[in-house]
Amino acid sequence: LRDHPGQISFPGGRVEPQDVSPAATALREAEEEVGLDPARVEVVGYLPVYRTVTGFCVTPVVAIVKPPVDLRPDPGEVADVFEVPLSFLLDSANHQRCTTQFEGRQRDFYAVPYGDRYIWGATAGIILGLARLLSLR
């Protein structure tokens, strides 16, 4: 990530002229960044727009990926790819609300630690949004 190097994130990026929808953007970015074949992806919907503290508006796309999956990360964009069980992500016992000082202001953010990995910020916020939505069903 150019704007957030070293952070854990979902594939994603800016809308390009050929993108006809947020799903088209997500599928294109996932193919470019991690080599995910769009034919193996079934888009099931969108989460509400997520606004980051740095001013970005993200439209999270929810999809099911049909196995088997052969990912080929772009080394210029992605250092590592890993999988976290959905049951772990949806378990509120694994969700943390944290506070830090940033540019002289107190900032609250979410985190979902997983083993030696620290999922936080917008990525954790999007995960918690999905968990909240699914808990209502």
Residues of each region from the PLM?
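Unchanged
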Residues: L1, R14-I119, L128-R137
